[in-house]
Amino acid sequence: MERYEVMRDIGSGNFGVAKLVRDVATNHLFAVKFIERGLKIDEHVQREIMNHRSLKHPNIIRFKEVVLTPTHLAIVMEYAAGGELFERICNAGRFSEDEARFFFQQLISGVSYCHSMQVCHRDLKLENTLLDGSVTPRLKICDFGYSKSSVLHSQPKSTVGTPAYIAPEVLSRKEYDGKVADVWSCGVTLYVMLVGAYPFEDPDDPRNFRKTITRILSVQYSIPDYVRVSADCRHLLSRIFVGNPEQRITIPEIKNHPWFLKNLPIEMTDEYQRSMQLADMNTPSQSLEEVMAIIQEARKPGDAMKLAGAGQVACLGSMDLDDIDDIDDIDIENSGDFVCAL
């Protein structure tokens, strides 16, 4: 890590701590996730690194490299100076339909690319979408800790993700198509941008987790009268929030929907995306062999010394619902509750 100068803490969570660093040679800023060496370097960490490494797209946080320190495995990635889309919604209350579409187009562009690379994210939510620092913000999908690749891994069966965003079929604990479940989560993100609340929470009892699950399973949602939403937008949401995953709208169908196509920036078109991907193929990246060797070495316990002064963030990541014995015992503050009440 000699080439990087630590600037400040930018977050913490179940994984460890994240810091903003500066490349002393280029002055470029990066975000680094530090994970303690030893037992914490498990299959989930390896999966996150391998899936993230394979993805190169303008709407996905760019993976740079993994580095080993005496105490930690460091994952170096692009730094998004604009913060979370979640924070932007908290500050705004809700977005206009045009602003929601602007970010939704970018979200779908990134998710479509992930799926084309045979990677399903499985934890799409506002907190896992960052913004760069530009005046016209570019959305960046991050956090591939729960992602699965159909090339590297079996079809998902575990119930992972943030409760408010989980698709009905994921709650069934049977094998499901992670790509189709991602579509549902994108719909929840769109709804929250438009309304400023989660679609399946009871407005009179938003912290009742059991009730939220029941409403998800029965696809019980509505758009409040005070929110003006076009007929095309309502139609798209009604095609996303379909309990039967086989009947749910697909990503290619979303990309052809009239609401999605309205004011679509040229950089969101398939032709432009393909040209960008061809250019990215020539971008050098850390070799697979080097990455795997570093991960294997990181499984060995490091020195007892710990990084000092971990920062704090409001959202500490998602939970795995398979680890929950009684949903009444859940701390709703950290389970996807929309903490910015309107």
From Swiss-Prot:
Keywords linked to the UniProt accession: Abscisic acid signaling pathway, ATP-binding, Kinase, Nucleotide-binding, Phosphoprotein, Serine/threonine-protein kinase, Stress response, Transferase
Induction notes from the record: By hyperosmotic stress in leaf blades, leaf sheaths and roots. Induced at lower level by abscisic acid (ABA).
EC class name: transferase
Any single GO BP term: abscisic acid-activated signaling pathway
Regulation of catalytic or functional activity: Activated by phosphorylation in response to hyperosmotic stress within 5 minutes.
SMART domains linked to this entry: S_TKc
E.C. number: 2.7.11.1
PTM comment text: Phosphorylated.
Reactions it catalyzes: L-seryl-[protein] + ATP = O-phospho-L-seryl-[protein] + ADP + H(+); L-threonyl-[protein] + ATP = O-phospho-L-threonyl-[protein] + ADP + H(+)
Highest taxon above the source species: Eukaryota
Entries under SUPFAM superfamilies matching the protein: Protein kinase-like (PK-like)
Protein name: Serine/threonine-protein kinase SAPK1
Species in which this protein is naturally found: Oryza sativa subsp. japonica (Rice)
Gene: SAPK1
